[in-house]
Amino acid sequence: MADDEEEIIQKVEVKPDEFNGLIGSIAGNLIRDKVGGAGGDILGGLASNFFGGGGGGGGGGGGGGFGGGNGGFGGGSNYDQGGNGNSGDQQKRKRDMAKDLIGGIFDNVVNRKGKKEQDNYGGGGNYGGGGGNQGGGGGGGFNFNDIGGLINSMGGGGGGGQRQGGGGGGFGDILGGIGSLIGGGGGGQYNGGGGNVNPNNLNGGMVNVIGNLIGEAAHRFLGVDPGTGRIIGAVAGNVIMGLGGKDNSLGNIGKVILDNIISGKFRRDVDPFVRPGPDPDRGGGGSGPSPISPRPTTEPQDFYELRDQCLESKRLFEDPQFLANDSSLFFSKRPPKRVEWLRPGEITREPQLITEGHSRFDVIQGELGDCWLLAAAANLTLKDELFYRVVPPDQSFTENYAGIFHFQFWQYGKWVDVVIDDRLPTSNGELLYMHSASNNEFWSALLEKAYAKLFGSYEALKGGTTSEALEDMTGGLTEFIDLKNPPRNLMQMMMRGFEMGSLFGCSIEADPNVWEAKMSNGLVKGHAYSITGCRIVDGPNGQTCILRIRNPWGNEQEWNGPWSDNSREWRSVPDSVKQDMGLKFDHDGEFWMSFDDFMRNFEKMEICNLGPDVMDEVYQMTGVKAAGMVWAANTHDGAWVRNQTAGGCRNYINTFANNPQFRVQLTDSDPDDDDELCTVIFAVLQKYRRNLKQDGLDNVPIGFAVYDAGNNRGRLSKQFFAANKSAMRSAAFINLREMTGRFRVPPGNYVVVPSTFEPNEEAEFMLRVYTNGFIESEEL
C-alpha cells in the first residue's frame, strides 16, 4: 500500500423486503386512508455508518428542472372558430351529441354519409375541413387575435393520410421567445467547491415555463384538436366495444406531446418489450438459472398493430404474454383474497385514463408491498414532460379504445414499450393493488400492471427502492443524501441540480410508534415530499435561499413556519417578484421554507439526475431547451463471470485484478469554480435480478473502486492494487440494484473497477459515469 494502513472493504446485506429506499420507506404515507408497504429504509442506518454524506465517499446531488424564463407570451384571447368538417351532418351533431365522434367514423356505427372504408375514418375536426383515411383530418381553420402581440395569424388547411395523418394550417409570424434561463455554479464535497452561482432569477421545477409558453398558441397542431386534446379522426372505440369511458384531461404539455406523436413530428427511440428468461447455454439447464444475459422468451408486441387489429375485428385485447390468472400475480405466495380480473368499464361507469385536478397526485398503494413504486409514480406526476414519456397520451377509454394500453420504461440503457390489456386484479369489485384516489382514474393501476409485466409478476414488485423505480421511469441516475451529515456547499449543489433538470425528494424519519406523526410546524414525519423549486429573495434579514416543497397529498397540511403561506416574511418581497414566482397561497400542499429551516427539519434527500439524452428529448418534445449545462454521461456494459471476470472486491487481492476495468479521462474542472476540481458520479447497476427473483436469484452485494492511474493507459495489475489505495470508492458493498457515489477530484486519468463483494458471484452490470465537463472512457 501507499501507506501503512490496509484498505478493507465492508459488505452489507439487507433483506429484500427492506428495500424501500429513502422515500420508498415512507411512500405509503402518500395514502390518505390506507397503510401499505413493508418498512425499513435501508440507507437510513447505513448512511451514518458507511456513507458519511452520500453514496461512495460523500457528495451532493443534482436537482430538478429548468430555471424560470423571463420572456413569454402575453395575454391572448378572442379566437374565432373556423368551419367544421364536411364529413358529417351538422344538424345531427347538434341533435345527438352522443354521436359526436371527432369527425367521420364508422358509417355503420353512427349512420353518417360516405364510404365506410375510407372517407368516414378521417373527416374534419372541430376547427377545420378534412378528408383522408383512418385518422386523417383537417386542422387549422381558426384565427387567434392578439395573443400577447406575438402571433399574427394561423392558417387553415386540409389533410389526410393513413392512420396518423392529419391536416392543419399553420401559424404565421410567431415571434417572441422564452427568455434567458438561469446560470449556476458548482458544488460538491471534496475540499468544497461551488460558488459563483447567479441566484437572482433561480426558479425551480423542470420546465415550469413550458405550460405558459407553449400550449395552444405556440404549437402548430396537426393531429390533435388543441381545444379538446382529442385525436383528429380517431375511431370511437368505446362505442364499438361498449366498455369505454371519458376522454383524457390533458394540459398544454400533454396536448403538445400527443400531437407530436400523432402527427409524426417526434418519434421516440423505443423498442418493443421482450420478456427475458434464463439462458440454458449459460447454466439455465441442469445447473439452475443463469443471471447472465437472459434470452428473450416472448415475441415483440407492437401496440399500434395490435390495437388496429382489435378495432378491425371489434374485439377487446387479451394479452397472451401476461395472462389474467395466478401466473401474473405471484410465483411463491398466493394473495389472501379471491381475485377477479375486471376491465375498468366493468368497475366503474365512466373510466378515464388521466383526469385533471389533484386526484392525479393522490396515488394509493393497495395491498402489494411496492410503496417504492408508488412514491416514484407520485413524483413523476409533478412533471408532465416526464409523466407523458412513461404514460403515452395517445391512448384513452374513448378514441381507439380496444382494451389495450402501453407504457414505456427505461431498461438498462434503452427504452422499451410494454403492452398490456386492461384487465386488472380486483376483490369485491375494487382494485386490489395501486390505484388513484379517484375511482374512475386508471393510469396508476395500469402503470403498475405494465411494470409487473416488465419484471414477470406482481409479486416480483415486492421490495425495492424509490430510486430504482425513478430510474426506470426517467432513465436518470439517483443519489441519496444524508442531511444529518450533508456534503459541503449543498445549497449550491441543489441550485446547480435544478438548473440541470434533476428531481428532488425529501423526508423526515418516521416515528415507529406514531403513524405519520404531524408535527406542530405542520410537517409530517415519515412522509414523502418533493422539492420543486429554489429561489433567492430579499427577506427581512437580507438575501435568503428559499425552497418550494410539495406535499403530494395536495391538501392544507403544510409548513406553518417562516416563509409559509401568508407569513410576514413575504412582506419584504416586491409584488413583481411574487408575480414572477407564480406565488399563490392556497391549501394545495405546496409551500415555501428557508434553506436553513429545511436543513433543520428534513433528514434525507433523494436526487434523480437526468442525463443529456433525457434533456434532449424534452427539448424535442416541447421546443424548450435548457440554457445551462447538462450532465455529460458515458455508459458501459459488462459482466462478472465465474472463474473469469468475477474477482471479488479489493479484500481478495489475488483475484481483484480479474474484474472488468474501465479507464475514465476527466479533462475539465467544474465551470465557475476556483478550486480546479471536477464533479463526477459513478454508478454500478446489476441487471435482470428482479426478473430472476422467481428463480431464487436476488441482488448480490456490489460496489466499485476508482484508482488514479497516472500515465498508465492499460489494465492495472495485482501489484498496482497491492501498492496503491483507491482514490474513490463506494463506502460499502450492498445488495442493492445500483450503487452510486459522487466525488469532486482533480482532472486526470482514472480506472474504475466495478465488482461483487465475493469472488465468482455472477451478474451482468452497467457502469454509468456523469460529469460536468468533457469525459472520455473505454473498457480496458
Swiss-Prot record:
What does the record give as the function of this protein?
Calcium-regulated non-lysosomal thiol-protease which catalyzes limited proteolysis of substrates. Required for assembly and maintenance of integrin attachment complexes which are essential for maintenance of adult muscle. Proteolytic activity is activated in response to increased intracellular Ca(2+) levels during cell degeneration and promotes necrotic cell death.
Tell me the enzyme class.
Answer: hydrolase
Q: Where is the composition biased (Basic and acidic residues)?
A: 269-282
The EC designation for this entry is: 3.4.22.-
Describe the family membership recorded for this protein in Swiss-Prot or TrEMBL.
Answer: Belongs to the peptidase C2 family.
Q: Which SUPFAM superfamilies does the UniProt entry name for this protein?
A: Calpain large subunit, middle domain (domain III), Cysteine proteinases
Where do the record's region annotations for Disordered lie?
Answer: 269-300
Q: Keywords in UniProt for this one?
A: Cytoplasm, Hydrolase, Protease, Thiol protease
Q: What protein name is recorded for this chain?
A: Calpain clp-1
Q: Which organs or tissues contain this protein?
A: Expressed in muscle and neuronal tissues. Expressed in the ventral and dorsal nerve cord, intestinal and hypodermal tissues.
Q: What happens when the gene is disrupted?
A: RNAi-mediated knockdown results in adult muscle defects which include irregularities in sarcomeric structures, disorganized integrin attachment complexes, and increased mitochondrial fragmentation. RNAi-mediated knockdown in integrin attachment complex component mutants unc-112 (e669su250) and unc-52 (r367) blocks the protein degradation which normally results from complex disruption. RNAi-mediated knockdown suppresses cell death in the neurodegenerative models deg-3 (u662), gsa-1 (Q227L) and mec-4 (u231).
Where do the catalytic residues lie?
C371, H527, N551
Q: Check the record and name the InterPro entries matching this protein.
A: C2_III, Calpain_cysteine_protease, Calpain_domain_III, Calpain_III, Calpain_III_sf, Papain-like_cys_pep_sf, Pept_cys_AS, Peptidase_C2_calpain_cat
**Which Pfam family, an example, fits this chain?**
Peptidase_C2
Q: Name one GO biological process term.
A: proteolysis
Name any GO cellular component annotation.
Answer: sarcomere
Q: Which domain of life is it from?
A: Eukaryota
Q: Tell me, what is one Gene Ontology molecular-function annotation carried by this entry?
A: calcium-dependent cysteine-type endopeptidase activity
| Calpain catalytic domain location | 316-611
